[in-house]
Amino acid sequence: MPDPGTTARLLGITVLGDFILNEGIDPILDNLTGRAGATAVALNPTVTAPSEQGVGSFQPPIDAGSSPRLFERPLWGERALWVRGGPSYRANEDFYADTPYVPRRPNDLTDAHGALIGDFIDAALDRGLKVYFQVGAVQPSGLRDADRPRLPDGNLPQDRMADTGSLASAAIRAYNRAYVRDLLEHYPRITGFRPDWPEYPCYKLDEAFQDFGPQVQTWAENRGFDFNAIQQEMTAFYTYLHGSLQNRDLEDFAGADRGKLSQISLLRRYPAALEWLRLKASLSVDLLQHWRDSITQFGGPEKELSANAFMPPLTLFTGFDFAGAAAHCQAISPKFYTMHWSAMVEFWGRVLLERNPGLDEKLLVRSLAHLFDLGDDIAATGLDAYGYPEPDEPHPIPNAPQERKIAQVLALAQGRARITPLVHGYGPLDDFTRRFRLVARSPVDGVWINRYGYLSDTKLDAIGDIWRS
């Protein structure tokens, strides 16, 4: 088990290369340390430039077309825009000989701006900040369908929000090992890595039924899981949810008992479902062990592994196991992305309404809000009570369930890893400070904020006031 390290509380902020290019190294570090009081920063090894529509990626991320997000700090004078990117370094392609995935090719942006990332890392470290790379846990460039997760029937999930790969993919793991080696060769001073989604994201209902691909089958059977039995029952459960769900199935979930009896009844009806949840958890822990081994091999045991993850109870669906992960991670950052919790009610609900004619929307929305534990007194009568909040709209998640989730994570981790929740900066000032204050004043080991682009100077000052008080 890795040493969780110092007991000093950490305050980290994610700053992507776009903003370093726009605002400069010293002004950003002044904001992080002077205004906010940050002690850590995370970034990615990428540099960008504005591009024409449809070229590159749209920022902020559109989250499968659902997000109305806007930056509060402009990029090239805009609050939302298309950008193209390039790696900040020239990869050693020899490292990638064991994987079909090749590193990103350097381009004109690499030549013009790539050195800025290394300069920022050095400047941040010289100011006493910890510096991490935030990277995808299973997201190589040019992800192939052969390495994408599969539904119980073997098909690819449709309309995914997170284009992540199979946790069992040998090709992706070989790429990860090479990528870690490459980054540590170019940036040997970094503190560690923060892999995102070392699990199966469950934003959409289809995503919750990942992964039944052949690579998972091989991995599972080699470890004693009855993959065929799991696949057969989860196919039946998926079919049930997509055409046989009835109002009487929702009454217990929508009621005061929040579906406790119904969940046990479903496990009796589909007993292999529990094995499926155990399989995903084992696979997530195994992936994190691979990350830890790769980091130790090329950077030494002192380089930190700090994983980003969903929150309970959603981790039951994603497979992230806090106790298991703590055996390999110095820190874990469960995401307090409350705009996503709200959006998921609508994402799942629209599919269930469409596929199950006659469902009562009031029963459904309360059932989903209870299933995700989004409040103690759910009064919503329709899915439109949730959805993706607008930039000036408070997130509809009260304090109590957030405090409950913190307690659950701390209990699950058992003190074996630092718990540093990841709060999202998106949203109006009062609502953001409510959410940040709640986490900052809880008994966790620190807080991360994603990301700098959503943090106006007023928000940065508020962070500093709360953190120092």
What are the roles of these predicted feature ranges?
Residues 14, 129-142, 194-198, 227-259, ...:
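Aromatic-lined carbohydrate-recognition surfaces of secreted/lumenal glycan-active proteins
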Residues 51-87, 139-162, 196-263, 326, ...:
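Aromatic- and acidic-residue-enriched segments that line the glycan-binding/catalytic groove
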Residues 19-34, 172-184, 313-325, 429-440:
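Short, acidic/polar
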Residues 259-274, 302-310, 365-432:
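Active-site clefts of carbohydrate-active enzymes
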Residues 26-51, 71-89, 186-192, 329-333, ...:
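Catalytic domains of carbohydrate-active enzymes, especially glycoside hydrolases
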Residues 7-23, 83-125, 129-188, 202-229, ...:
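Active-site-adjacent "subsite" loops/lids of carbohydrate-active enzymes
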Residues 141-150, 201-205, 301-344, 427-444, ...:
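Substrate-binding cleft/loops of secretory-pathway carbohydrate-active enzymes
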Residues 196, 230-273, 320-391, 444-458:
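Aromatic- and acid-rich polysaccharide-binding/catalytic face
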